[in-house]
């Protein structure tokens, strides 16, 4: 009896668990990070699209198209040109403990890869390229239920409220003396916090951890009214009012919104009259705000980032605002500041979304619903395009949907990696044996040449027979069959002789 492929029951390992099949349709809340860099070629700032045309002209290997003019890097991040800057973006990373550090690691891994490709471009074109840090964007999912958004809990009101809450702590962790503001943008299904690029991976991870902890906590407040700040004792500078963001909808805590420039003032001077009636320093305001949200920050933070946040807030570690000027590392990102494997995989494994996207970019096939599917592209941030190998039918799956097949995908990838390792070991063993055979043949030839040279000396007419040394001429090696016959045991020879007679 022949059963068609469409009637075959999927293997148990390929079927989604029952709990996953009943999961809510909105998907997991996630974060994502972006960084923008000005491009300096031969000490002149240029538009990258005018010089390179496309990221494909920088990266030497094949790239997976994401959307528009952006392409995925082998690291899982994306690169594209945006209004005169090079922008790097991380994949979606589900919100869980260590998500801020994972996002920072992904961003800096992509930055290191891009820097290596630019180094190769420099050698090919004999020109110099520098990346100057411009800004960093921290994106956090907004997932308030739709029936509650009508109760003044909209993403726009949340962004306005967060501009007041995040200003002081983000300034202390991420800004420098040449910064101009901290912004918050409502982006539909997410909140985007914008700040200057931080040329220190540890400080960036600490900033991401603080932002995601505060945003997720404020998102759960019953009201997004500014009166909540006074009720919870969160200090705000008197008279502070954010301005509208210049590029998109949103608000910015710009230096002109304060009585003095907070980016150039002494962070330890109690010079700010606050809504609580006290005069506090910038560090004190940031510390009190951080303590108010410490439970949420601690829940989502990794140990290293939590220690650094506490150290900066208490003054045990310096803020970039305390330096006399902006660090030189801003002017050559990827060289003067690098990723030094701050969060190794053994301590902080990849997130599930990272693993899904990594398999898709690598083109590793996965078995779903009884058929093999091969990824052929990516749509936007959250969808992968597959082609069913049996009939070529295309199928678009979200990252959340692919979580149900991630374990089977991992097993397939691990099995193929193991097979490749075994094949590599076999190839190396074959190469070793071939090299040993070549050396043995070469040594035999050298011995034969030396013997022939000695024979030539014996036959030299200038030497007499009495003076010539006695040298036995080498006998020709018997054929392999004869040599094998001679080396065979007597019992085998006698047995073979009886059969031949």
Regions found by a protein language model. Give the residues of each.
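Acidic, His- and aromatic-enriched active-site or binding-groove loops in soluble protein domains
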Residues: 151-172
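Histidine-centered divalent-metal-coordination microenvironment in nucleic-acid enzymes
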Residues: 128-144
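Short regulatory "switch" loops immediately downstream of catalytic or recognition motifs
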Residues: 43, 143-146
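Terminal catalytic/cofactor-binding subdomain
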Residues: 2-123, 132-134, 167-182, 186-191, ...
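Inter-helical turn/loop segments and adjacent helix faces that build the functional surface
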Residues: 124-125, 145-151, 222-225
